[in-house]
Amino acid sequence: MRLGESALVVGEVRGGEARALFEAMRIGAAGRVVLGTIHGSGARDTFERVVHDLGVPQSSFKATDVVVSLASLQKTGSLEKTRKVVGITEVGKDWTQTPMEESGFITLGVYAGEVFSVRNLTNSSILKRIAFSKQTNVSELLRHITCGAVFYEMLAQKNIIDMVRFLELKTRFNPIKQEIARSNTKNYAKLAKNELSKILKQYET
């Protein structure tokens, strides 16, 4: 599925399309983002499946920047299952044989004990590349990401799914997000939430 000129998404990768996906990743055919979904329990399992089962060359797997792992989890004493992100792994580029044996996998986030914790973000190569492309630093980029997370979380909580309204809110919130991200305030997430609450109240009245 191509989303305009900025994104290419290939779902349920399990056959010959794997080579096409990784070739698109390697040359950046979609311009900005190339995404694929595949059955695998984590970064290691994904590597094994892509390289050994689907026949993608190991060198081509390096085109992957990040592996996001999801799982269906069941709470103790409950039959209900919820789908959660359980791991975010960056794929380094300085390995020759396998990323598992040469420290090629860098954990950026992991879900354990009902808590999702992040780590190694300031040393992330992919975040440094993104920050460089946006002419900023990793710390400011992380503030942008956090403010963006606040935005999407609050809209999800209020079940705002109308695209017109979503774009209006995003247009109004973006300048505020930019200002907050560039500031040195420590409570930037709380500030973003407060400012977005004000905007949402104006739409509710």
Where are these regions (language model features)?
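Switch/coupling sub-region of P-loop NTPases
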Residues: M1-L73
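Glutamate identity and glutamate-enriched acidic tracts
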Residues: E5, E12, E17, E23, ...
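Intrinsic-disorder/low-complexity, polar/charged segments
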Residues: E17, G42, N137, D162-R165
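Phenylalanine-focused residue identity feature
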Residues: F22, F47, F61, F105, ...
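Short, Lys/Arg-enriched charge-dense amphipathic segments
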Residues: R32-G40, Q58-T64, E80-S103, N184-K193
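A hydrophobic alpha-helix/topogenic segment detector
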Residues: D45-F61, V66-V68, T76-T82, Q178-T205
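Conserved P-loop NTPase
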Residues: V66-A156
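Terminal-proximal interaction/regulatory segments of ATP-powered molecular machines
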Residues: H144-T205
